[in-house]
Amino acid sequence: MKKAIFFDMNETLLNLSLLKKQFEKHFEDAFVLKYWFTKLLYASTVVGAMGDYTNFGALSGATLETLFVESGKELTPETKNEILSAFRHLPAYEDVIVSLKRLKAEGLKTIAVSNSSLAMVKEQLTNAGILDLFDAYYSVDAVKRYRNGCYTRLGSLWR
């Protein structure tokens, strides 16, 4: 039997440091990134709990717009694009490449899973230099359910 390990991407494999710089630039406070990302994950959880689905890119943008409104700042289309496009170029954490190679050497399959679109997943893995270390990668867009909903469904199959 082949064994596989599934990896979340953002904050697990990929370092949000580039996003941190964007939030420091626009809010003078890097902590705002954590607030925004928490709001984004919360929004995806609520949407999923309602049995609905919204593309994660659109949800990211809407959450960013809300954050700017809450902060009394204007979000131009250029600024929005600048911040959100940083997602495409997140570096892998220092230990990721060595760890993935070790898992591959042990014969384990490695699979990346993300709320982002499939094109975005491939672009992120490519830009981080780790695409070739994965046997497969998936986006929740294929099933129109966020990962938390997918995990719930998978868990019910094991009962």
Feature map (PLM): residue ranges:
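An amphipathic alpha-helix signature
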Residues: K20, L33, F37, G57-E65, ...
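Active-site neighborhood of HAD-like aspartate-dependent phosphohydrolases
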Residues: M1-L41
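Short, acidic loop-to-helix structural element flanking the phosphoryl-transfer center
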Residues: G57-A58, L75-A112, K122, R147
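A metal-dependent, Asp-based hydrolase signature
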Residues: T45-N81
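Substrate-recognition "cap/lid" segment bordering the active-site pocket of phosphatases
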Residues: I111, L118-R159
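Short helix-capping segments at alpha-helix termini
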Residues: K25-V32, E70-L75, A105, G129-L133
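A short acidic, helix-capping loop that chelates divalent metal ions and anchors anionic groups
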Residues: Q22, S44-A49, M120-K122
